[in-house]
From Swiss-Prot:
The gene is OPG201. Disulfide bonds: none annotated. It is found in: Secreted. GO terms for cellular component: extracellular region. The keyword Glycoprotein applies. This is Interleukin-1-binding protein. Glycans are attached at residues 80, 103, 113. It comes from Monkeypox virus. One of its GO terms (molecular function) is interleukin-1 binding. Belongs to the interleukin-1 receptor family. Keywords: Glycoprotein, Host-virus interaction, Immunoglobulin domain, Repeat, Secreted, Signal, Viral immunoevasion.
Amino acid sequence: MSILPVIFLPIFFYSPFVQTFNVPECIDKGQYFASFMELENEPVILPCPQINTLSSGYNILDILWEKRGADNDRIIQIDNGSNMLILNPTQSDSGIYIYITTNETYCDMMSLNLTIVSVSESNIDLISYPQIVNERSTGKMVCPNINAFISSNVNTELYGADIDALEIRDLNNGHLELLP
């Protein structure tokens, strides 16, 4: 009688199950339509313009600010990342800033252009925010980024033609309402 070799073959093969998700590449939404020009040594706050549209329907887990081609050590994220602060900026802080918003399934980024000018070379026409309101109708003027710097005991100064003929009501949130 001969002995037959017995080979045991497993019925089940062990293979570790690893679930992987493909993280999508960030969608580049391009450059924001408004450029920011600020004075040297005055705090700068850059807003994340997409926060209002994204927060309505998306669960944003992370917001990251970067400066293209430079270290990010001068960037301070405020308001849960929806704004970026630079204290005492210099002209070397001028450049393209990128903010990246991500959640579990989505990633997009947009860039903002920041130019820091010295006080000696500044021109108020470049830094002012011209807005036109028809004097025959109620209008609302919005001063960009003013909420970050305004306090309740600050008087607002307005300059313009026939400004005395209008009633000005401060809505206490950085908005002024002009009534004929």
